[in-house]
């Protein structure tokens, strides 16, 4: 009798345990499922609203693009070569100039708290800054222009998309994702190669002269490094997917803003942290 009661109690205990485990499992699955569905709904809603904005204003953007083409023409060399050169030059020095103004004047003082290496370049040495500017402009124009011409001929060989028709918003996002992927791969391996003993000593060491970099030192490097690490990797995705020139311009601008931030020496609020790259320059 006692054995039967113990057995029944054991069943009772087991019976109580099983629902508890099952209910816990169901709770976990419910939470995970809710998070996944919520995240998917958020992403879908976000892209829907962005697509709605893009779609509702598609005629506006297309009209502006037509005005640009009517003004400067739709010749591929004019757009892809000189248009890309001017755009990247302006974006680099406009936003890089803002960072440089902070480093030269040490103002506003409130931003000094975000300096990654306090006490360095406060203010920046003017002679060293001029040296950087001269080298960067040389890289952008003397080195960059022939490479842009070469990339134009490669795109022409591949086949340009219709220049008059802007791509859809979703297609732009998809292409930029591809651009980021191939740029990351290209830059990683080219940069790793530059840290080999021979290439570092004769090529990459110039870029590391700034152990506490400032924004405009992003393109301060040996011309061969500029070609292999700064020009070719961002172009890989553009060539692979055959991007529209407008998409390429958006991507080039984003890439420039990213590298300016990475070399800025500031970890500003809401900006991606450049600390890893900043301390990498100390090596």
Residue ranges, per PLM feature:
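Non-catalytic, topology-defining segments of multipass membrane proteins
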Residues: 1-189, 193, 197, 202, ...
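C-terminal transmembrane module of eukaryotic multi-pass membrane proteins
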Residues: 226-283
